UniProtKB/Swiss-Prot annotation:
The gene is odhA. It comes from Bacillus anthracis. Its cofactor is thiamine diphosphate. GO terms for cellular component: cytosol; oxoglutarate dehydrogenase complex. It catalyses: N(6)-[(R)-lipoyl]-L-lysyl-[protein] + 2-oxoglutarate + H(+) = N(6)-[(R)-S(8)-succinyldihydrolipoyl]-L-lysyl-[protein] + CO2. Keywords: Glycolysis, Oxidoreductase, Thiamine pyrophosphate. GO terms for biological process: glycolytic process; tricarboxylic acid cycle. This is 2-oxoglutarate dehydrogenase E1 component.
């Protein structure tokens, strides 16, 4: 028996989905058709059926009393509640967001659900029963449905139901449903928007007519991209943002440069004419790049605010700019002028990434970069993504380019709110932009705008798109531009008349003609066809003393071996660290990891910040670094490099996600924007670095030559043949050497801890100078603790990095030396170890060994001076552990031929050509390695072929 209590009505606090749930539970309670929560059962016993009594004001202003349990409307209320949620979640399926398609045809599940309820049913239900925050003027459920359909199924469509944070989801729905986003624009802003669209369209059409057939990758069809970027930049500036970073591909790039980044039309036209124009700022390197790859930096302002906007240089490798720009932003956000971790302020900058609709789901670098968005080492406080969606990728339709309904669907997996907007509705586009920037600034998370338009011409302007998309291009040919559509709307609304609209058009045309008239004729002088490397680059890195006083090194080492009282270091790690205690004393030896830590500390003390990332960089892949300690009881972390005295620069070391491409791009971008920082990326094994090959090819090796974009990024690539198979042996040095030219980077493979110490300090010393360049290091694995790679304290406190080293105790009788062996890295240590072992007898008087520590630029003068000492030299041999078609041989061969001259033979000893870098059998590997070593040291071997074992040949 229900004990009806009339003094209190607990149901009054239930609304919408919550009320629907309680009503559904009461139905189960009454019918006994299912289990009901005990607490609800008690409420039902005390208070009876859930009720909501209200006066329902209908369209004719008459009021009726409504009570669900009295009218038997429980099922209808549930359907309305479900319908409201379906509109919120699936309204996008009915929205008119594609200007090339008609509105949805009403066959969706959502439309069917709407048809199950009559207007009379909906009028009988009070609005607040199903929508607690129903705005003023919304009285019935019918009003609710009409209002929500207006919000969710027009030219703006929203996907928020996948957002896991309920606070964020509620905020998004409230922003949309309160209609604050769609407040009418002032006539002044509407006129300004039309002027902007007229400028964008006029610029593109002027290029089309003036430079017939030249590629420009027109923005036409998604013209609203420019005002959308304007709005985001302006609103960001109002929020105090100092830097806005933009990454985008070539589609629409020229218009963005001209309008958002204010590149003068005359400078754009000069690039098309191949003319020199006064005042043009060179933003390219000595080889340059095509105009639609170039970036720009510009302070953008209006009468109220200003901010710096950077459009990143970009190759045609779509989407690879994404992590680069994220690195820009993180660098701009961090204060690196104090010891410890950098201090990050995400309100100082943010990123806008403009994607293609085919590239966003198609390129894996997109998901790699999205995965960085909430990681401590990489998050930038939210990126605004804009898909410039023209529904076709070159000639490929969307049904052939993605497996999802929308090109934006990938973003759902990363909890990113999505707004689809019709690019032919300018004011809706601005509303989307406004929501995006507000969300980013409030929640510090990513947001995506799917700007759906079309492509008026082919992939480029010489391409005929009707060949592959004949039907849609019939539509596009007759479809008015967004400028024309908006001009008609403003004229119909009485904002502007026809004459005023024509005046705006004529003003744009006159401006374009005037700027074009400023451009001189094409420059056809010989100077324009000669590419000259700047002298400061051509002369390379000059010798730099990088030693550190011994007392300073000892003080640093003491600090490195200290940790807070009560901090429990893992016993095995503690033992490793304690072995380093006497390393800098008279008879001590310094291993690789300690040399690195000493270098880091000394660099920090000189005011240079350091950032190191990689998949296992805190500990080190080979358990050697231990630069971050973990308390065994609390898992609290501690890095001694954060507590050393006399440091006024930050140090950060992060374990990265299992990604190479995105992380390399990010670190490159960070370094470009923070040129004073020693930024290092470490591969888990060098073999895996090739998944970032596009970044090495397009950015790290060529960025300065193409764009004048300097970088001092350090790549640490573990390399060495130790019988671990083809996936854990080779960093493929041949690829980095193939890319080496014009002093674009340094490639090194070192043989001692001291050399590593000095090259790191040398690299730090050139940061922020014209001499700066990336450093590619083939780092050791088994050599990390090898006795022959250990160094003394004096070797760190004195001298500098040596590009070539001579093997000690060889070449002491110059007139007897017949064979000069050149090698690098682990191969050189294997040769030294064989000599030291004394296991075999060799005529060592007739041999000399030189370790090439710096492969590129090759230390020709040093090696030539060594060769001149040996008057009876007969042969110069390059010895390597990699197969002949890999490693350094093909890079070294022409160098050796030139060094040897006509009278001295040159030769190769190593494995023969192979398709795989290494074999999988450790015993076969060991046998091959022993043959290489013995043949290299046996002067009597005298060049023969043995394809089954190793390959030896001469010229």
């Amino acid at each position: 028996m229900t004990r009806k209590n009339t003094t209190t009505n607990p149901w009054a606090k239930f609304h919408g989905p919550n009320l629907g749930y309680v009503i559904e539970q009461y139905d189960l309670y009454v019918t006994g058709a299912g289990s009901v929560d005990p607490e609800l059962q008690e409420l039902f016993e005390i208070f009876g059926a859930p009720s909501f009594q209200d006066d329902v004001v209908t369209g004719d202003n008459t009021a009726t009393h409504f009570s669900p349990q009295n009218t038997g409307n429980i099922e209808k209320i549930l359907k309305v509640v479900q319908l409201v949620e379906q509109i919120r979640s699936f309204g996008h399926t009915l929205a008119h967001i594609n200007p090339m398609e008609d509105a949805a045809n009403g066959q969706s599940l959502l439309e069917k659900a709407m048809n199950e309820l009559s207007d009379a049913d909906l009028k009988a239900i009070p609005a607040k029963t199903v929508w607690q925050d129903a705005p003023e003027g919304i009285h019935t459920a019918l009003d609710v449905i009409h209002r929500l359909k207006e919000v969710y199924t027009q030219s703006l469509a929203y996907e928020f139901s996948h957002i896991q944070d309920s606070e964020e989801r509620a905020w998004l729905h409230q922003m949309v449903e309160s209609n604050s986003l769609r407040q009418p624009l002032s006539n002044k802003k509407r006129t300004a928007l039309l002027k902007r669209l007229t400028a964008v369209e006029g610029f593109e059409q002027f290029l089309h007519k003036t430079f017939v057939g030249q590629k420009r990758f027109s923005i036409e069809g998604v013209d609203m991209l420019v005002p959308v970027l304007d709005e985001i930049v302006l609103e960001g500036a109002k929020n105090g943002v100092e830097d806005v970073m933009i990454g985008m591909a070539h589609r629409g790039r020229l218009s963005v440069l001209a309008h958002v980044l204010e590149k003068p039309y005359s400078h754009m036209f000069a690039e098309f004419k191949h003319a020199k124009i006064e005042g043009a700022v060179a933003n390219s390197g000595w080889t340059g790049d095509v105009k639609y790859h170039l970036g720009r930096e510009q302070v953008v302002s209006n009468e109220e605010v200003s901010t710096r906007v950077t459009l990143a240089n970009n190759p045609s490798h779509l989407e690879f700019v994404n992590p680069v720009v994220e690195g820009f932003a993180r660098a701009a956000q961090e204060n690196r002028k104090k010891s410890g971790l950098p201090e990050q302020d995400t309100s100082k900058s943010f990123v806008i990434l403009v994607h293609g609709d085919a590239a966003f789901p198609g390129q894996g670098i997109v998901s790699e970069t999205l995965n960085l968005s909430r990681l401590n080492a990489y998050q930038t406080g939210g990126t605004i993504h804009v898909i410039a969606n023209n529904a076709v990728g070159f000639t490929t339709d969307s049904y052939d380019s993605r497996s999802t309904k929308y090109s934006s669907d990938l973003a759902k997996g990363f909890d990113i709110p999505i707004v689809h907007v019709n690019a032919d509705d300018p004011e809706a586009c601005l509303a989307a932009a406004n929501l995006a920037i507000q969300y980013r600034m409030l929640f510090k998370k990513d947001f995506l705008i799917d700007l759906i338009g079309y492509r008026r011409y082919g992939h480029n302007e010489m391409d005929d798109p009707a060949v592959t998309q004949p039907q849609v291009y019939k539509k596009i040919k007759n479809h008015p531009t967004v400028r024309a559509i908006y001009a008609d709307q403003l004229q119909a609304a009485g904002v502007l008349n026809a004459d005023e609209i024509e005046t705006i058009t004529q003003f744009t045309q006159e401006q374009l003609k005037s700027d074009y008239a400023q451009v001189p004729p094409a420059d056809t002088s010989d100077a324009t066809i000669h590419v000259k490397v700047p002298d400061v680059v051509a002369k390379g890195i000059q010798p730099i003393d990088t030693g550190v006083e011994l007392d300073s090194l000892r003080a640093i080492n003491e600090g490195l071996l200290s940790w807070p009282e009560g901090f429990n270091v893992y016993p095995k790690v503690k033992k490793i660290l304690e072995r380093r205690k006497d390393a800098l004393e008279e008879n001590g030896k310094i291993e690789w990891a300690l040399a690195e830590s000493l270098a880091f500390a000394s660099i920090l003390q000189e005011g240079t910040p350091i950032r190191l990332t990689g998949q296992d960089s805190q500990r080190g892949t080979f358990a050697h670094r231990h630069i971050v300690l973990h308390d065994t009881d609390t898992n609290e972390t501690y890095s001694p490099l954060h507590r050393l005295p006399n440091i006024n620069a930050s140090f950060s070391v992060h374990n990265s996600p299992l990604s190479e491409a995105a992380v390399v791009g990010y670190e490159y971008g960070y370094n470009v924007f923070a040129p004073e920082t020693l930024v290092m990326w470490e591969a888990q094994y060098g073999d895996f670095s090739n998944t970032a090959q596009a970044l090495f090819d397009q950015y790290v090796s060529a960025g300065r030559a193409k764009w004048g974009q300097k970088s001092g990024l350090v790549l640490l690539l573990p390399h060495g043949y130790e019988g671990q198979g083809p996936e854990h042996s080779s960093a493929r040095p041949e690829r980095f050497l193939q890319l080496a030219a014009e002093n674009n980077w340094t490639v090194a493979n070192l043989t001692s801890a001291a050399q590593y110490f000095h090259i790191l300090r040398r690299q730090a010393s050139i940061l922020g100078t014209e001499a700066v360049r990336p450093l590619v290091l083939m780092t050791p694995k088994s050599l990390l603790r090898h006795p022959l790679t250990l160094s003394t304290a004096n070797q760190l406190s004195e001298g500098r990095f040596q590009p070539a080293l001579e093997q000690e105790n060889l070449g002491t009788k110059p007139n007897k030396v017949k064979r000069l062996v050149l090698s690098t890295g682990k191969m050189a240590i294997d040769l030294a170890a064989e000599i030291e072992s004394g296991r075999h007898e060799y005529n060592l008087d007739e041999i000399h060994i030189v370790r090439i520590e710096q492969l590129y630029p090759f230390p020709a003068e040093k090696v030539q001076s060594i060769i001149k000492r040996f008057k009876n030299l007969e042969e110069i041999i390059w010895v390597q552990e990699e197969p002949r078609n890999m490693g350094a041989w093909h890079y070294m061969a022409p160098i050796l031929f030139e060094l040897a001259g006509d009278k001295v033979k040159t030769g190769y000893i190593g494995r023969p050509d192979r398709s795989s870098p290494s074999g999988g059998d450790p015993f076969a590997h060991k046998a091959e390695q022993e043959l290489i070593v013995s043949h290299a040291l046996d002067v009597k071997y005298n060049f023969r072929q043995d394809k089954l074992e190793i390959e030896v040949f001469s010229n």
